[in-house]
From Swiss-Prot:
UniProt name for this protein: Cell division topological specificity factor
Listed Gene3D superfamilies: Cell division topological specificity factor MinE
Disulfide bonds listed in the record: none
Keywords of this entry: Cell cycle, Cell division
GO biological process, one term: regulation of division septum assembly
Stated family: Belongs to the MinE family.
SUPFAM superfamilies on file: Cell division protein MinE topological specificity domain
Gene source species: Synechococcus sp. (strain JA-2-3B'a(2-13)) (Cyanobacteria bacterium Yellowstone B-Prime)
Function per UniProt: Prevents the cell division inhibition by proteins MinC and MinD at internal division sites while permitting inhibition at polar sites. This ensures cell division at the proper site by restricting the formation of a division septum at the midpoint of the long axis of the cell.
Length: 100
């Protein structure tokens, strides 16, 4: 009974630490597999934000970018909360209107 109590007591703490260490290791492995420097990742982030911002207004406080590895595949995860969709402006429709 005492051994069960000690096992439960210590397994909670080690499980929590174990999960944190596992998450850190996954993040490190994802960065290594993608072979991206922090500067390259930041450059990609800024470029993605620039392109997406042309079409929608983003909530900058809720944005998240991170690398994730699952099943040997590394993915860049971008969570971009959208406030509103911007009106679509196309050069084609303007030039057609001017010709008519």
């Amino acid at each position: 009974m005492l051994l069960d109590f000690l096992d439960q007591l210590f397994s909670r703490h080690s499980g929590n630490s174990r999960q944190q260490a596992k998450q850190r290791l996954k993040l490190i492995l994802a960065h290594d597999r993608a072979d991206l420097t922090p500067a390259a990742l930041e450059s990609m982030r800024l470029e993605i934000l620039g392109v997406v911002s042309r079409y929608v207004e983003l909530d900058s406080e809720g944005m998240q970018f991170h690398l994730a590895t699952e099943g040997g595949t590394t993915a860049l995860i971008a969570n971009l909360p959208i406030r509103r969709v911007k009106p679509l402006e196309t050069g084609l429709s303007r030039s057609e209107g001017e010709k008519a």
